[in-house]
């Protein structure tokens, strides 16, 4: 299965999700994208620090979501707003979900941008929990 995680800039939440999923969902192809990403931008230092603390695979550099990404089997967004923006722009293809919604939970993944390293660690724990449920459900 090809899974694409989506956030705003593809430098904080979705790269963390990508790294966790690459470790947990080894039989799947994992990508991350941003709705307003600057192609080639590095992952935030704090996100990278949290990823390295857990010895996870390093994520790819930022890449903006494009029509090609609609070929993913599953597109999982960090917030309901991200989901709504994708559906509004590309239509509802039945494969776009908010991550928490897809695994039977409620709520957005908090954007840690501009926060302390502890905020990034909290985001990591939230994503670890949800992706753990994703693995269990797949």
From Swiss-Prot:
It comes from the Bacteria. One of its GO terms (molecular function) is protein tyrosine phosphatase activity. Its EC number is 3.1.3.48. Pfam families: LMWPc. It is an enzyme of class 3 (hydrolase). It catalyses: O-phospho-L-tyrosyl-[protein] + H2O = L-tyrosyl-[protein] + phosphate. SMART domains: LMWPc (SM00226). The active site is at 7 (nucleophile), 13, 111 (proton donor). Keywords: Hydrolase, Protein phosphatase. Belongs to the low molecular weight phosphotyrosine protein phosphatase family. Dephosphorylates the phosphotyrosine-containing proteins. This is Low molecular weight protein-tyrosine-phosphatase PtpB. It comes from Staphylococcus haemolyticus (strain JCSC1435). The gene is ptpB.
């Amino acid at each position: 299965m090809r899974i694409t995680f989506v956030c705003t800039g593809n430098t904080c939440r979705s790269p963390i999700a990508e790294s966790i999923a690459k470790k947990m969902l080894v039989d799947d192809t994992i990508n991350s994208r941003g709705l307003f990403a600057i192609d080639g931008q590095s992952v935030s230092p704090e996100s990278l620090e949290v990823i390295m603390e857990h010895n996870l695979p390093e994520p790819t550099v930022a890449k903006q979501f494009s029509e090609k990404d609609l070929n993913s089997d599953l597109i999982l967004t960090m917030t309901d707003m991200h989901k709504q923006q994708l559906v509004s722009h590309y239509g509802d293809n039945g494969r776009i979900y908010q991550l928490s919604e897809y695994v039977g939970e409620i709520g957005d993944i908090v954007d840690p941008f501009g926060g302390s390293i502890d905020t990034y660690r909290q985001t990591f724990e939230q994503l670890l929990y949800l992706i753990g449920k994703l693995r269990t459900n797949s």
